[in-house]
Amino acid sequence: MSIQKIWAREILDSRGNPTVEVDLHTAKGLFRAAVPSGASTGIYEALELRDGDKQRYLGKGVLKAVDHINSTIAPALISSGLSVVEQEKLDNLMLELDGTENKSKFGANAILGVSLAVCKAGAAEKDLPLYRHIAQLAGNSDLILPVPAFNVINGGSHAGNKLAMQEFMILPVGAESFRDAMRLGAEVYHTLKGVIKDKYGKDATNVGDEGGFAPNILENSEALELVKEAIDKAGYTEKMVIGMDVAASEFYRDGKYDLDFKSPADPSRCITGDQLGALYQDFVRNYPVVSIEDPFDQDDWAAWSKFTANVGIQIVGDDLTVTNPKRIERAVEEKACNCLLLKVNQIGSVTEAIQACKLAQENGWGVMVSHRSGETEDTFIADLVVGLCTGQIKTGAPCRSERLAKYNQLMRIEEELGEEARFAGHNFRNPSVL
């Protein structure tokens, strides 16, 4: 079924910043998609087009991207006569029209908005749930419910506290199902709230951009201690492990790392990549840390490779790989990490996101699907993670509706699958063995 109409508009994301929403019409109805936006963005990400007009939304408007859709992309896709089930052809047509390496002509936020809407329309055209349509696009016969990685303590660029490292996550790998994982996660989250309140007072339980608590602590080990205490207190020591997103590019200064980067600069307190690696080794020894994302700067390749060779845990590339096949290929060659963080808006189309996922999986990597810190009520990534069988997703704490929208959709998918539903659990790094 060909496209009848495409219309884009500017809406607001969960941080109150403008983002792009796209309505796509076919004979089957209206299909709507909204684009997320990151705070700690890798310099190699596809370009998110902002207006730059300081008189409007402090320069963050997206009317240019919206206009590119309404004036150029929409007429081209409609006149092509392509069916919405032809995802790759439609995505490639947009990439050709843009013609740049990093989507800087139209903006990745313009192309992705249309690409997501096409995918939703394609599923309806086939009379399939979105996750099954995505599985078909990826050539997958399996469907797997992921382990959620709940970001329960926020730091870095996501919170106004002193904490340098950006996310401290809990993964309920011992849960029996996704629904059970949600319960475990929520119970530990509420227990953690009590632990933080008792230690630092009620104002320390304010939440960051992704719904995690943001107590004003400086030591990253203190955050790990709080999470461990909450897990133990909730009674889930055997069922829950810890993940971290360090987002080290945010505090990389002149070849060294500043773990107090939110205070006035002081070169004397900066540490080397080796020293930072030793700190992580301590974390892994002392806490049930099984996954560390972006432990080093996006260009500190030597530190990545050395560290990954020396630890037996999951090392996730985000700013390093930016869901980009060329960066992934280099990371595979240099053995820099062993898991890809998949963010559709880093690369800017559904087709390229699927290709990036397959490339990582073919090289024996894990894949974790991810939200952005600036989110919307769109639930596309919930269906994406099931269809791509990656076995793990991070989309914030069990708090804030733009986060819960994804988790709730995953519970619905699990319910819909019934007996067919399989939960990744302890195999979250390699769910294909299920």
Swiss-Prot record:
Residues binding Mg(2+) 2: D245, E293, D318
SMART domains linked: Enolase_C, Enolase_N
Reaction catalysis annotation: (2R)-2-phosphoglycerate = phosphoenolpyruvate + H2O
N6-acetyllysine: modified positions: 5, 60, 64, 89, 126, 193, 197, 199, 202, 228, 233, 256, 335, 343, 406
Gene3D superfamilies, per the entry: Enolase-like C-terminal domain (3.20.20.120), Enolase-like, N-terminal domain (3.30.390.10)
Annotated residues for binding of substrate: H158, E167, E293, D318, S370, H371, R372, S373, K394
Biological processes annotated in GO: canonical glycolysis; gluconeogenesis; glycolytic process; response to estradiol; response to xenobiotic stimulus
EC number assigned by the record: 4.2.1.11
Active site, per annotation: E210 (proton donor), K343 (proton acceptor)
Cross-link (Glycyl lysine isopeptide (Lys-Gly) (interchain with G-Cter in SUMO2)): K202
Modified residues (Phosphotyrosine): Y44, Y287
Binding locations of Mg(2+): D245, E293, D318
A Pfam family annotated for this UniProt entry: Enolase_C
GO cellular component, one term: growth cone
Positions where Phosphoserine occurs in the chain: S263, S291
Self-association state and partner proteins as the record states: Mammalian enolase is composed of 3 isozyme subunits, alpha, beta and gamma, which can form homodimers or heterodimers which are cell-type and development-specific.
Function: Has neurotrophic and neuroprotective properties on a broad spectrum of central nervous system (CNS) neurons. Binds, in a calcium-dependent manner, to cultured neocortical neurons and promotes cell survival.
Protein known as: Gamma-enolase
Organism: Rattus norvegicus
